[in-house]
Amino acid sequence: FVKKYALEGKAEIGMHLHAWNNPPMYQLEVAQEGAPYLIEYPDDVMEAKIKFLTNLIFERTGIKPVSHRAGRWATNEKYFELLSKYGYVVDCSVTPHVDWKTSLGQTEGSCGSDYSSAKDKPYSIDTSNGSSVLEVPVTILRSHKLFLKTSSAKNLARSIWHAMKGTELWIRPNGDNLEEMKYVLDQTYVSDRDYAMFMIHSSELMPGGSPTFKDERSIEKLYKDLEALFAYASVKYEGIRLRDLSNGKESSANKRTL
């Protein structure tokens, strides 16, 4: 299904790896209740998993992936070195303003990556093998703006609390954040950032595929929000693939890329 659009330049097939169910299987010592990050595995196992999934994507689609996002957002120097080795030129795993250290891994002391001080615009990551990977961070806005949730007193209180302490706004639907996503698009457009990045898991597009969208009613609401969001975005943004960003492709006049 996706291959047709990828070949037409309307979509992109990238690589996204969750280490615990990606061959070859390898048993880590279990010391914590979190799911294991790829960066917890020995270097040779990390490489074998990346090689396996990269080859599988090519075998199934005939397309060599060059873009990547890490499972559970975790990266390190070795990870980028291996991505470069297997032909990846662009990554989108960095989540500015977000610290994942409370998201535990499986081995003793393991946790997620801390991106709280990360750049929010594209930058090059040099690797030890002399090559580089373009990092295109996820669009996340730190904000104190109050978005009133009138559906219940509980939601109203939560909105006020988030505005007081500040919160991270993503272009990531949760069933109740259409206005927030539009706000991020608007703020990004008037900033010095030349793209906005939307994200969603494919499992979230079906009833019961995630804790966020548990039934058909919530999925219908999701699709209505997506239609409204992309209609709104299309006025000031145009779609682009990560591989095109890495090649320096520019957006049309007066438009940003999404």
Q: Model segments located where?
A:
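Metal-dependent polysaccharide deacetylase catalytic core of the NodB/CE4 family, i.e.
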Residues: F1-A70, A74, S131, R142, ...
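Hydrophobic faces of well-ordered beta-strands that scaffold small-molecule active sites
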Residues: I13-L17, V66-H68, V90-C92, L134-V136, ...
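Histidine/acidic-residue-rich catalytic or RNA/ligand-binding cores of hydrolases
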Residues: P24-M25, T102-T107, F147-K149, P207-K214
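Active-site-adjacent pocket scaffolds in enzyme catalytic domains
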Residues: A70-S191
